[in-house]
Amino acid sequence: MKISVIGAGNVGATAAHRLAEKQLAHEVVLIDIVEGIPQGKALDMYESGPVGLFDTAIHGSNDYMASADSDIVLITAGLARKPGMTREDLLMKNAGIVKEVTDQVMKHSSNPILVMVSNPLDVMTFVAHASSGLGKERVIGMAGVLDAARFRSFIAEELNVSMQDVNAFVLGGHGDSMVPVVKYTSVAGIPITELLSQEKIDALVERTRNGGVEIVNYLKNGSAFYAPAASAVEMIEAIVKDRKRILACTTLLEGEYGINNVFCGVPVKIGKNGVEEILEINLAPAELDALKHSASLVQENCKSLEALLA
């Protein structure tokens, strides 16, 4: 198993190290355009092996040839958000970056699974799919896993319970229009509505929607990377180990939930073939409307990129 990570910034480097520590591949390759950065970070990670108790080979390069014959490629490349910048502000610049990255990846790997992290996530997943020529099941966006992790952590903090006992789904686009689904949120099987007031739930939902912005505002010059990296690795682990995990991920919808030809976050089964099944769960009318609205915003942004992808 060979996994390449494109982008040696905070998310990419953190994910690469986590992949190595969990020994999910015999080789992890870190690629970046800045000379010395992927090489130095990869060497530093490799030297942590004796202490971290892993034998994964880790290499850094500025040449996409190093990614040749990758089974999975994690794409994190792109510009980071700055305070006051929305994901949509990043749209055109990152779309060009992701198209170029995908073109380079596909020159050297014939049928990889692409896991997308670059923002705006849903639109960048669309760009990667359009540029790669891969089947829709092999291009997956990391959105709901991260958003659900934030929602779960906030609930656990509020109730003073273990995060492991909190289950939640967050659907829709990875942005302000995301849809935390309260109906399927529980703590050790107990519906969240029996444990928290509606007012408190609404506050936690709103905090989840602004989870990325909250961190950006603290950091001033940067954005979240520990949780995004961990979320991407959780998806990759499900693929590598064929675990058939049910996770909320961005995938191409073709009629599911009444949504057509849009990449949007929904519950899917993740295994060795990527997205192996899209699950259509029952949503309250307001939640379904919110999901469709979220998808429509993604579709609008995708249409603005038609010239770039022509």
Curated annotation (Swiss-Prot):
Write the record's keywords in alphabetical order, separated by commas. NAD, Oxidoreductase, Tricarboxylic acid cycle
Binding residues for NAD(+): 7-12, 32, 94, 117-119
Which SUPFAM superfamilies does this UniProt record tie to the protein? Answer: LDH C-terminal domain-like (SSF56327), NAD(P)-binding Rossmann-fold domains (SSF51735)
- Pfam families, per database record: Ldh_1_C (PF02866), Ldh_1_N (PF00056)
Where does the record locate the signal sequence feature? Answer: none
Catalytic activity field: (S)-malate + NAD(+) = oxaloacetate + NADH + H(+)
| EC number annotated for this UniProt entry | 1.1.1.37
Q: Which GO terms describe its biological process?
A: lactate metabolic process; tricarboxylic acid cycle
GO MF, one term, reads: L-lactate dehydrogenase activity
Q: Where is the active site?
A: 174 (proton acceptor)
List of residues binding substrate: 81, 87, 119, 150
> Could you tell me which InterPro entries the record lists for this protein?
L-lactate/malate_DH, Lactate/malate_DH_C, Lactate/malate_DH_N, Lactate_DH/Glyco_Ohase_4_C, Malate_DH_type3, NAD(P)-bd_dom_sf
The protein's role, per its UniProt record: Catalyzes the reversible oxidation of malate to oxaloacetate.
Q: Which family does it belong to?
A: Belongs to the LDH/MDH superfamily. MDH type 3 family.
Q: What HAMAP family would the database entry show?
A: Malate_dehydrog_3 (MF_00487)
| UniProt protein name | Malate dehydrogenase
